[in-house]
Amino acid sequence: MQHFKTLSAYLDYLELPGPEHPMLSVFSAIGDGFLPCPKESSPPITNDCYSISLKKIVKGNLNYGRTKYDFTNGALIFIAPRQVLQWDESVVYDQKGFSINFHEDFLKGTELAHQIKKYSFFSYSANEALHLSPKEEKQIESIVENIDIEYQNNQDDSARIL
């Protein structure tokens, strides 16, 4: 199974644009924008990154560990480092939503580095993504817009506060 140790290598494999920051990437398609599509299919892979994404899958399944995620109504998905991901060409994405990806070392030396391991939504025990109401989706999109602004404008050490 292929494993990606850096965020850049993982995004390159997915055929997505490289990150603005070596340990953090933000892809946002809020409003009239479109999310870039990852490569069409993938055998099982792992990486050293966390991902938080809001996606809608028009058809097909994304396999995460032993679980198939249901994205038809739009849902937040949380992926932890070294979790197994796999998808095939049957997956068709709606190109709206967002994806925030960060290397586990991005959190090094922070309280969140210890706390994040307690969040069950990053583990296999969560059998499906977190489904959002339209109101919740708008609230999350607003937060992500602010994160994206910070990501695009501040690439120094203070960006770790994101």
Annotate each language-model stretch with its function.
Residues 77, 82-87, 107:
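Histidine-centered metal-chelating micro-motifs
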Residues 153-162:
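All-alpha amphipathic helical-bundle segments outside canonical DNA-binding/catalytic cores
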Residues 13-16, 88-153:
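A hydrophobic/aromatic-rich effector-binding and dimerization subdomain
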Residues 66-80:
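Short acidic-glycine-tyrosine-enriched beta hairpin
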Residues 1-63, 67-69:
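Generic protein-terminus/edge-of-domain signal
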Residues 45, 133-137, 159-160:
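Amphipathic, non-membrane alpha-helical segments in soluble helical-bundle scaffolds
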Residues 46-49, 73, 94-96:
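A structure-centric signal for secondary-structure junctions around beta-strands
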Residues 57, 81-83, 102-104:
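Residues immediately flanking
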